[in-house]
């Protein structure tokens, strides 16, 4: 189906769409009630913060997304990966409404925005003949994450005392 280099590009796209999940609504929504309880905010307040941060990230994506055409893809992908890692760490340290806004902005921008943008742009550049087939293949990464991450996350949060020993056993 795909040649060696083509397969590497597909795997790259699959991985990036998989990890774009950290900025997707289905994943961030898993923490909604815990965040609202910790910060004593309502559903409406959380929704307003979420929507505002998402809009800001989409506007900035328009400006920064075009940088993928100016920067070597390996360097660009590395920067996006580092930004997502920082975003996840920052998201885990939310302590105020202002931090919540910034954390959601970072997660939406780096995860949903830049990770998926990097995946689709890279794959679209590489494939000319089978572009549709290649893009549909990489988006299986997001579908896989929609199945795997919520289960793994709920398990990890619910059984925190068992998570480390389980990982060490595997």
Name each model-derived stretch.
Residues 40, 93-95, 128:
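Helix-breaking motifs and short loop linkers at transmembrane-helix boundaries and internal kinks
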Residues 59-84, 88-91:
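Conserved MFS/SLC helix-loop-helix module at the cytosolic interface between two early adjacent transmembrane helices
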Residues 99-113:
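Hydrophobic core of transmembrane alpha-helices in multi-pass small-molecule transporters
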Residues 114-127:
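Intracellular juxtamembrane helix-capping segments at the cytosolic ends
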Residues 132-149:
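Glycine-rich segments within core transmembrane alpha-helices of 12-TM secondary carriers
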Residues 160-166:
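Conserved small/polar residues in nucleotide/adenosyl-binding loops
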Residues 54-62, 147:
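Residue-level signature of mid-helix packing/kink "hotspots" within the transmembrane helices
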